Curated annotation (Swiss-Prot):
This is Epididymis-specific alpha-mannosidase. Gene3D superfamilies: 2.60.40.1360, Glycoside hydrolase 38, N terminal domain, Glycoside hydrolase family 38, central domain, Golgi alpha-mannosidase II, Golgi alpha-mannosidase II, domain 4. Its main location: secreted. GO terms for cellular component: extracellular region; lysosomal lumen. The gene is Man2b2. Keywords: Glycoprotein, Glycosidase, Hydrolase, Metal-binding, Secreted, Signal, Zinc.
Length: 1018
């Protein structure tokens, strides 16, 4: 193991790497004071604010004012915003403005949080960055220019593109595979220019600095003391700061007796690090988790130490200075060195030691992961619905200020949960509950907003009661009493494409009639519910233009009324099969039951109750395919070996089947056929522990996206303790054990199986944020997910998805912070499967992933006996984009800053006696090209659209201004630093040139993301 395993990779990289050089002295150390402030993790946000976070900003500001040479970088915005709005005095606010102006306080990264890179979706990464950047720019007129991504557990290749588009000049990471980092240190390859996307030009690359193995914390061991070094304020105490100001583990104060020893320790560490880099400039991070809550004692000890070293530069061979990232990267950039290039590979998965693979968190707390994505999808729909309500003219009584507040609350919650100890599932239970509460409260507000828009009037108005709103993968439940009663259902399509799909409502009666807004009957199906044996699932076929509505009336059918025969939803037929044992002898493949549509024939084996094969009707190829649930067993005792926990995946052995018997039933109707498989852990069990509900839409339905997908929803749990559950799909595809999985729903990574000498199973697990696939020379099997999972290919033709984990161990760290993941929940994840020729799958894969993430939203209102159905808004002009272009956001952000940077700075200098009202006139539009260059002969072409035509339903477009990713830069003013590389990058297309404001015809190239402010005629 160790660095030798990476020699082939390093050999390839060195071809693009300049010859290593030893740093020319004297060494210049940049001491960067910082505090790593997790937005959650072990303690809630409010607990952290009370115990230490507020004191960080209060004391740092005071100490920076005291000493002109002092510096500090601030990273995540959530704690700072809470301090700014709820703690800071006017004097402190003015001091912050002055320190920012002087460059002694620097905001880096600037997002609401430091987001995880493995399991977060691109849309949500952009959201949380936009939230933080919007606040900083609106409040101070500043725009962060460097990243500080030091704690996410691995690094995604999406990040270089993301941060380049945000305007960053350099990027800093830390957690990459331990043996790769060791090898890169020895080869002086920790700094390079990273090309994030194979399709994009060098304008969307970024200079990247990988921290050495000391990472972002100051070395804690000093040879002359049994206390930690350089942590003079000690360790934060919860729930309250100690009244005497004495904290645990406070470093020995710097005195005349020990200052030389301190200096020797610091100098030795700087020199050790300098050998790992190509220049004499050394970044020396001073800080760690929850530091600088007493900045006075920190600086009062470091000041004399730095002075002591600088007075003896000739003796020590180094100089030291307080620095921000701008100071460090400016010095590095001024060397004009030629840097190596890293292509679009990521740094995933991440292992910190040989037996510590951080791949368990890809699945930990699956329920929270699912809720976070549901909240994101709801916010996405709510943003465009509110924008369509506001333009061209608000027609209802809705208060726009209240509406924007609901959206802002959910923006905050969705941004917060992207933190690297949030959606990852690596937080304590009470912090998980905090994230959940914030998400649910935000979703409730946006639900009220959407019901008000779609069903008319202010929140709660009208004679009928709004029932609820449901996003994708959530089924609304309608109940009735003995009176004739019905429901008005509005279905909103948040995508800028026309869609044909099936929505599901759960009702309490089998006789239902459904009509559209014109009173015409629609295609429906009713069947026994999968959730409640006393209820029924009502399926409705719907076709909806982009950013538009369909309205339906759902009534309890009474048969003949006044001579009119109601059209009742046809009832599906159910066929049940007897229970089958897993090890029961059978003549496999002799009694197959087909389920088919225009695209597929699914064959199920009556003798096993298992999927047998799938025929792709386009290519006429039949692929043998089985699916089953298995479990990995995890060790709980640290004395017995490696353990699994929230972070780590360390199975004892290969996965074993977790069931003894399986039942099956088929429910066939006019719209779909459902196949329901129930897996029992033991033959004597009355309750099943696992299930697969497979749905195939029928051939008469239009729409290739609907026909080409096999929808599956699973039930998993509750698990036995120390079990990690997977769904393994095995096929006869000759995949060569090569898996492809996505980075953040943006780009795919090739994942060949690696034969590690130790820990091979978990080190071959990868994050699947939205999709994964395996293929051979003829066919591709695609899996699409509505929440993150761990995914792996442990055998040829296999792909396994980890669905759930339940763990407890006796590791002292986990027990101290309650991080053992004893998750007793039942989870219901969804996957869509697609199988077909690679060309067909290439075309359908990106659009289908977006369709799963952003399904139609159903809004319901109960009707009284005589009440007329509410048909809600009708938008005559849909918003329609080409199939290779995705409407990533359409919103009214509410920012008050001027689009002119100079004017905005003048406004800030004048000051505002009161906070200005939100700007409801500015519309934010972001478009994303879904395809890689050369991926598809048609869909990989640049997409050209006229925004005046696309947005005509919102009004007359009078100006189009292109902005940076988070909206704070006019792209015509954005000039990022150029870092010289050995080879000119010839790959990628030329980025389309910015057009002057008002130019409405735009071209988006493969994988481009372009952001605009749109101005409509008043």
């Amino acid at each position: 193991m160790g660095p030798l395993r990476w020699l082939p990779l390093l050999g390839q990289l060195l071809l693009l790497w300049p010859r290593a050089a030893q740093p020319a002295g004297p060494i210049r150390a940049f001491v960067v004071p910082h505090s790593h402030m997790d937005v959650g993790w072990v303690f809630t946000v409010q607990e952290s604010m009370r115990a230490y976070a507020a004191n960080v900003y209060t004391t740092v500001v005071a100490e920076l004012v005291r000493g002109g040479q002092r510096r500090f970088i601030a990273v995540e915005q959530e704690f700072f915003r809470l301090w700014w709005d709820g703690v800071a005095s006017e004097q402190q606010k003015q001091q912050v403005r002055q320190l920012l102006h002087e460059g002694r306080l620097e905001f880096v990264l600037g997002g609401q949080v430091m987001h995880d890179e493995a399991v977060t979706h691109l849309d949500d990464q952009i959201l949380q960055l936009t939230e933080g950047h919007g606040f900083l720019y609106e409040t101070f007129g500043i725009r962060p220019q460097f990243s500080w991504h030091v704690d996410p557990f691995g690094a995604s290749a999406t990040t270089p593109t993301l941060f380049a588009l945000a305007g960053f000049n350099a990027h800093l990471i830390s957690r990459i595979d331990y043996d790769l980092k060791d090898a890169m240190q020895e080869a002086q390859m920790l700094q390079f220019v990273w090309h994030g996307s194979p399709s994009l030009s060098g304008q969307q690359e970024i200079f990247t600095h990988v921290m050495d193995h000391y990472s972002y914390c100051t070395p804690s061991h000093i040879p002359f003391s049994n206390r930690s070094g350089f942590y003079w304020n000690g360790v934060a105490v919860f729930p309250e700061p100690p009244p005497d100001g004495v904290y645990p583990n406070m470093s020995e104060p710097v005195t005349g007796a020990n200052i030389h020893l301190y200096a020797e320790a610091l100098v030795a560490n700087v020199k050790q690090r300098a050998a790992w880099f190509r220049t004499p400039h050394v970044l020396w991070p001073w800080g760690c988790d929850k530091q600088f809550f007493n900045a006075s004692v920190q600086f009062d000890n470091m000041d004399p130490l730095l002075d002591y070293i600088n007075q003896r530069t000739a003796q020590f061979g180094i100089s030291v200075q307080y620095a921000t990232l701008n100071d460090y990267f400016q010095a590095l950039h001024a060397t004009n060195m030629t840097w190596g290039i890293r292509d679009h590979q990521d740094f995933l998965p991440y292992s910190s030691e040989p037996l510590q693979a951080w791949t368990g968190f890809y699945t930990s707390r699956s329920t929270l992961k699912g809720l976070a994505r549901q909240a994101s999808a709801l916010l996405y729909a709510g943003e465009s619905m509110f924008t369509r309500y506001m333009w061209p003219d608000p027609s209802g009584t809705l208060d726009p200020t209240w509406a924007l507040q609901q959206l802002q609350q959910l923006r905050w919650a969705v941004s917060e949960v992207q933190h690297h100890d949030a959606i990852t599932g690596t937080e304590s239970p009470k912090v998980k509950n905090m994230y959940t509460e914030h998400l649910r409260m935000g979703m409730l507000g946006v639900r009220k907003l959407m019901v008000s828009i779609a069903l008319g009037g202010p929140p709660g108005s009208g004679t009928g009661a709004p029932k609820d709103i449901m996003g994708p993968q959530v089924t609304p439940v309608l109940s009735v009493d003995t009176r004739p009663v019905g429901y008005s259902a509005s279905v909103y399509n948040p995508l800028a494409w026309k869609i044909t799909t099936i929505i599901t409502l759960t009702v309490a009666f089998p006789n239902v009639s459904v009509t559209d807004e014109l009173g015409h009957p629609v295609s429906t199906q009713i069947q026994n519910s999968t959730k409640d044996p006393s209820a029924y699932d009502l399926l409705i076929l719907t076709t909806i233009p982009g950013l538009n509505y369909r309205h339906y009336q759902v009534m309890h059918a009474r048969g003949d009324q006044a001579g009119t025969r109601e059209l009742v939803a046809p009832r599906a037929n159910t066929l049940k099969f007897s229970l089958k044992l897993r090890n029961q002898p059978s003549q496999e493949g002799k009694r197959l039951v087909p389920v088919m549509n225009d695209c597929y024939i699914l064959l199920f084996d009556q003798d096993t109750n298992m999927l047998h094969s799938i025929q792709d009707r386009q290519s006429n190829r039949t692929v043998r395919m089985t699916q089953e649930f298995l479990e990995y067993q995890a060790n709980w005792d640290v004395k017995q070996g490696p353990i699994s926990d929230n972070y780590l995946f360390a199975p004892n052995n290969t996965a074993e089947p977790s069931w003894e018997a399986v039942g099956m039933e088929m429910v066939a109707g006019t719209l779909v056929t459902d196949i329901r498989q129930y897996f029992y852990r033991y033959i004597t069990d009355q309750e099943y522990i696992y299930s697969i509900h497979t749905r195939l839409a029928h051939p008469s339905l239009a729409g290739e996206l609907l026909c080409q997908r096999i929808e599956q929803q699973y039930r998993v749990g509750p698990l036995d303790l120390n079990r990690e559950a997977i769904l393994r799909t095995s096929s006869d595809l000759n995949s060569q054990q090569v898996l492809y999985s996505d980075n953040n729903g943006y780009q795919m990574q090739r994942r060949p199986y690696k034969a590690f000498k130790s820990n091979p199973i978990p080190r071959n697990y990868y994050p699947m944020v939205q999709s994964a696939f395996i293929e051979d020379d003829k066919s591709r099997l695609v899996l699409l997910a509505e929440r993150p999972h761990g995914v792996s290919s442990q055998g040829n033709g296999q792909v396994e998805v980890m669905l759930h984990r339940r763990l407890w161990n006796n590791l002292a760290w986990d027990l101290k912070y309650n991080l053992t993941l004893n998750d007793t929940s039942i989870v219901h994840p969804v996957l869509w499967l697609m199988l077909g020729p690679k060309s067909t799958m290439t075309a359908l894969h990106p659009r289908s992933g977006v369709a799963l993430q952003h399904g139609p939203v159903v809004l319901l209102k109960e009707l009284a006996d005589e009440e007329t159905p509410v048909h809600g808004p009708h938008n005559p002009w849909p918003v329609t984009l080409p199939p290779n272009l995705h409407l990533q956001i359409l919103s009214v952000p509410g920012w008050t800053y001027s689009r002119s940077h100079a004017q905005h700075l003048r406004n800030l200098q004048r000051g505002h006696p009161e906070k200005p009202q939100a700007n409801l006139q500015r519309v934010l539009l972001r478009l994303r090209h879904l395809y890689e260059a050369g991926e598809d002969p048609v869909l990989s072409r640049p997409a050209t659209v006229d925004l005046k035509v696309v947005l005509r339903g919102l009004g007359s477009v009078v100006a189009v201004e292109e902005r940076s990713l988070t909206g704070t830069w006019d792209v015509q003013m954005l000039q990022r630093w150029h870092w010289s590389t050995k080879t000119d990058h010839l790959k990628g297309h030329p980025t389309s040139p910015p057009r002057p404001p008002g130019g409405s015809i735009i071209t988006v190239y493969p994988k481009e993301i372009r952001t605009f402010f749109i101005k409509f005629q008043q």
